[in-house]
């Protein structure tokens, strides 16, 4: 088995035209590098090996994909299979099938897993908030459902998952709390309650808050000001996640996120970038963020690169990530990890958001799962910094 893996490893390496070093190796002295994985990468591989016909969302060689994922990323995050509508579709009914496959696959490849996510207003089934008659439940009932949900899931994965996004997207872009069902029934207390329940269920794991548009000062300051007194009182939270769904030309992300990292650090918490991608396509309506309810109508002018990303645009894409990773390195004391959202362009959610049916190029691997030049350029940048640091250390010893 080991010999076969090594052969496949070098075969994949050759086809992707990369050196032996990977992204996770290149940046190991600065922060951790991960990627989100959907259940089809795992489910399809299992079915391919068992000779089962697969006709899922992705028609690629899933086994080869995951070898590259295992090579380059030390951490994986599930895209959807741990969200409430999938894992807890009915009261008292849990389905861990896909999530277990994903976790088992990651652990078998020496990777660690971050759970995503426990409490989120979206992709949460309606039953969570109503009784048998369809009436809104009381605060006490919702608390119990939250606690049962969190305890059951964390108990199931105890010892296999190192950290969880406990609460996801609870704030509006202006820094105010979102008026979700959780908020309507429990008020702002649902957030510290979720962290309390998670810590009680498994005190050994890291716990995170996660949100989009965290480059906006109003939002990051609203989030930080909310957590400041809670952290001072000992709330069990280890980091704040900033999703990082970015649009090329839509602002100075390096400057904005530098401010956000420092703002989060002011309350003693680390930052992590949890859902990184970059669209090179036109912005339909000055849109920013990741609110999945926001959609625009398809227009051909909004989908200009159906036959491939022009060389100039690819070079801009590459330089963006070089600048962004340099920013992460410059702030490495306060950055826990950087996680890319989706492995390749074919699987990226950005093809259908905020406009359905576009051809987007938001990830570091193309539609054939071949690494873009960006990957090697990032590795080269890290190697160059390492050589520079070694040279400076030698010079200081003289």
Task: Map each language-model feature to its residues.
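Substrate-binding cleft and catalytic face of glycoside hydrolase catalytic domains
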Residues: 40, 71-89, 98-215, 282-284
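Bacterial Sec-dependent N-terminal signal peptides
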Residues: 1-23, 390-398
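A general structural detector for well-ordered alpha-helical segments in enzyme core domains, enriched
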Residues: 64-65, 69-72, 95-105, 149, ...
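Short, electropositive alpha-helical surface patch
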Residues: 128-147, 178, 217-233, 351-363
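Structural preference for beta-strand elements that scaffold enzyme active sites
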Residues: 30-34, 75-77, 112-114, 161-165, ...
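N-terminal pre-domain/capping segments
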Residues: 21-90, 96-100
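Aromatic-rich peripheral "rim/lid" segments of glycoside hydrolase catalytic domains that contact
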Residues: 156, 165, 169-188, 194-197, ...
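Noncatalytic carbohydrate-binding groove/subsite architecture in carbohydrate-active enzymes
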Residues: 25-30, 38-63, 181-298
